[in-house]
């Protein structure tokens, strides 16, 4: 009878223990299993559940009948407890139900739209400590030079790397500062990134960054540098041409203050204009007119950067210098020819040529139509501005001289 009673008490303890474990497990309790499992012991569990070992201590149990019964129950409890895994032990130890669920950590998003560097929290502690401080970008880059390649060597897309994106936001902030305008080197920026990413990946990456207002200027200047760099020209050209960006729009967004032919960024823009011209203008008679229009537009963007005195022959000389750059021989020569024609327009105005007289002098109606018709039309525009009292209708005059093609030429010229 006594043995059956002991067995019943033992089973009751076991089922009570299992019920507590299952209840705790199903409640979704959140525990630090590793730390709790290392400190779990029977006495601590008993004290939390307001239980006690027989006689207060298993080592000092008295050898009485009641003590022997309690000791058997205690041993059965300990045997069942020790067979549980660590998770169930921890649940049984705490016996606490928590309804609090930790809020999910929001995913970091870098594009599109600008995000200040200090609002982004990378996982890397060294990077976080650098980015949240006020250290100059150059010193940050020196320290990140050890971090960047190691972290990004397995990242196929730079935009997926928190370190790269956060760092570039910091670089962009620095480049807009008074000190950064004079010291920012895109060659150095390229050298920092190129060990981790190929030119093709960098080109595609920076073309995409132009959609981010905070990084647009940095991206465009970086692309301009890579365009003029012989080893990366082809990769950047393909990526930029794929975007279909017209050079005139890039010129406006880059906000050039002066046409410095020694400036890598300005030369990079000219290089892209050359690639654009070769890519979008096929060899045909009608397309040749649009190509001439394209070169006049490039000239009109550059000319206002110089004073009147310098434009007299100065731009012609500078454009001829572009012919020494590989891949820009024809582009530079076409711009030099236009600069030469524009210089002659000033001479024709000083000589008081009438539009009719200049049309015959340039032999526009002969085989020189493509070369000279836009020069003549530009002269007519300046002539009517200088001599407003002399009415002249260039379209009517062209129809009389050239016939049907005159209307198409005038429509193309109207886009200039």
UniProtKB/Swiss-Prot annotation:
Inducing or repressing factors: Expression is up-regulated at the earlier infection stages.
Gene Ontology cellular component terms for the protein in this record: extracellular region; host cell cytoplasm; host cell nucleus
Compartment annotation: Secreted; Host cytoplasm; Host nucleus
Keywords: Host cytoplasm, Host nucleus, Secreted, Signal, Virulence
Coiled coil: none
Primary localization: secreted
Motif (RxLR-dEER): 49-88
Superkingdom of the organism of origin: Eukaryota
Signal peptide range in chain numbering: 1-20
Description of its domains: The RxLR-dEER motif acts to carry the protein into the host cell cytoplasm through binding to cell surface phosphatidylinositol-3-phosphate.
Family membership noted in the UniProt record: Belongs to the RxLR effector family.
Task performed by this protein: Effector that partially suppresses the tobacco programmed cell death induced by cell death-inducing proteins.
Record protein name field: Secreted RxLR effector protein 25
